[in-house]
Amino acid sequence: MPTESSTIILASKSPFRRRLMEDAGLSIMPEAPRVDERALEAPLEGTGVTPDEVALVLAEAKATEVSARYPDVWVIGGDQTLSLDDLIFHKPKDMDGARRHLLALSGKTHFLNSAIVLARGGEAVWTHVSIARMTMRPVKPAFIGRYLARVGEKALESVGAYQIEGEGIQLFESIEGDYFTVVGVPLLPLLAKLRELKAIDG
């Protein structure tokens, strides 16, 4: 449980996001947001809200909910959506879902929309969205099966059923965008803003 003296709270229980920020030198305390993401997202469907805007809505909801409980601490909230044409993908629930994701993405270009929000006193102070363009090579169903057998349930941890920092890189033909955007944490603009706010040493 974070305390009011924590340097920065991460509104997430993701060990990967926490490790990424700690490796960058941030003092992080995780706190799970009390947010129903699908309930927030459902009213946005069919309204013309773009996938990057959906990511921002969810990131802001996470950050401000936790910030309302810890108003004197900087809170980071993040979210990432994967969009293919007009579809927004969610994390696969099982290995069959992961297979369907990869088959749908095979040979096509999709986008990873990564939003990050800084909040304090229950209010969003700063928001940022970065977008990466991901082109997957045409992948045969048999290879997808072998790939999923090798990576196992790690495939269920990401919205695209792949981890670009691991064997998932073999699925791709080209990537346009910052590495940290691809993994869901636009770290460079976040660090720049934290330095500007004097929340970290700069």
UniProtKB/Swiss-Prot annotation:
Cellular component GO terms held in the UniProt record: cytoplasm
GO biological process per UniProt: nucleotide metabolic process
EC number: 3.6.1.-
Location of the protein in the cell: Cytoplasm
GO molecular function: nucleoside triphosphate diphosphatase activity
Site (Important for substrate specificity): 16, 80, 165
Official protein name in the record: 7-methyl-GTP pyrophosphatase
